[in-house]
């Protein structure tokens, strides 16, 4: 048996739902999707859900993962085994841990490949900081997986599809975190997963002010701006949501233009699936050139304005 009888899908990030649904179609005969509102439910049915389970009644101060109890109860009530697919977001991983405990299921994070053999899930994901691929065969009746972005292509909606809708009522867990306040974060983040062209900057750009040069190039060619982990995590020059690498974004654009990025394996795991990689780096021995289809050895601060002017013509 190379499919599960049923799969359960949930995404706290609506943009990740289409790819999870496409994976679900390949892995199971029946697709159940948990959603938070009617709009997401309608989208899930168009993407192939046979049954939609609307999570309802959570107080605003409680976290999404507090639905784990009623989600696990629902899953158990409808089968003695099954596969649970979640995005590898922070909320997704927290929910995966809670579901794994309640379902007595093995949990595997950041899956890059999922297959079914003899009714059991086989999962591949990066290990040792991206230096190798690890393979796990999950033996528990239920398997809970968080899926890396780009593992599956996005499912296409079909308005002619139909499905059944159910409601799952909130039940307060015995122990939970209560949100006492929220603070809006200033962010210009975009959905980089869908970008055709990406310009990504590393510390080799020199300063936060020099990132404006990359932004001008983005405007000239219609690209989105990304960065390496040190730019976001160490220097705080850009938002966390924009860094590319094994522990965050895994991109597959048509063009990935790496500016001042050395090309360490942890970063390249997130960019190596790009159709074309173009690198600019002053160090001719930088590892990035081992991955690049095209490269320029030189100072990005001098090269970017000239490149922008040429491409803007």
Swiss-Prot record:
Keyword Flavoprotein belongs to the record: yes
Gene3D superfamilies: HUPs (3.40.50.620), TPP-binding domain (3.40.50.1220)
Cross-referenced Pfam families: ETF (PF01012), ETF_alpha (PF00766)
Pathway stated in the Swiss-Prot or TrEMBL entry: Amine and polyamine metabolism; carnitine metabolism
Entry binding sites for FAD: 255-283
Keywords: Electron transport, FAD, Flavoprotein, Transport
GO molecular function, one term: electron transfer activity
UniProt GO BP: carnitine metabolic process; fatty acid beta-oxidation using acyl-CoA dehydrogenase
Function statement: Required for anaerobic carnitine reduction. May bring reductant to CaiA.
Subunit structure: Heterodimer of FixA and FixB.
Family: Belongs to the ETF alpha-subunit/FixB family.
Protein name (Swiss-Prot/TrEMBL): Protein FixB
Source organism (scientific name): Escherichia coli O7:K1 (strain IAI39 / ExPEC)
High-level lineage: Bacteria, Pseudomonadati, Pseudomonadota, Gammaproteobacteria, Enterobacterales
